[in-house]
């Protein structure tokens, strides 16, 4: 059974593509028809592609991998943040800083600065420093949280990227491709699907459409995590049972 229904996709307006004059011919296979100068996406293909992306991210999660959610356009910012947090993943929803993946060592120094400023405040330094300096530190902190808060706990490269609008996030995609990090993307009719490993043909401009699909990808990750935890529990239970059996055997021998 599909993880998403045609009804859900229709209600969220996932089928509305861009104007026919603003299209990428490579998306032709995902287009159903044209209506009033707008391309209509083939939702049967979207259903199948959502399944593929879902299963991939579920597997990444089962294997203990992490996913970086990227969506800096206004329609995606809130969904990307809330769904990444819900799934315990990382996100960038303001601006992609150049080298975020390819020069992570430098970026990680800036992330470290977040903790440094927090410690300064905890240690009471804000109370003894000049007021002007404290104001500047708070501004710096707010700026760092705004742009890097979503990856402050990211200690290594993500195992996958989930991207809303590849055209908008072309820098993120270029860096991920350079590092061979698989990409799942919501791809509208004006985008190049060849840059994306797991294409989800869909409207990337409607908030409801973006939220629905982003939530589904978060669900996949959560399901994968559940699989991991279930296996761990089962393994622990087997160990406990083995120990119990050994203990019972020892007691029987002693008797």
From Swiss-Prot:
Annotated stretches, region: Disordered: 226-255
GO CC annotations on file: cytosolic small ribosomal subunit
Gene3D superfamilies in alphabetical order: Glucose-6-phosphate isomerase like protein, domain 1 (3.40.50.10490), Helix hairpin bin (1.10.287.610)
Molecular function GO terms recorded: structural constituent of ribosome
Alphabetized UniProt keyword annotations: Ribonucleoprotein, Ribosomal protein
GO BP, sorted A to Z: translation
Family, similarity comment: Belongs to the universal ribosomal protein uS2 family.
NCBIfam families from the UniProt entry: rpsB_bact (TIGR01011)
Protein name from the UniProt record: Small ribosomal subunit protein uS2
Source organism per UniProt: Staphylococcus aureus (strain JH9)
Organism classification: Bacteria, Bacillati, Bacillota, Bacilli, Bacillales
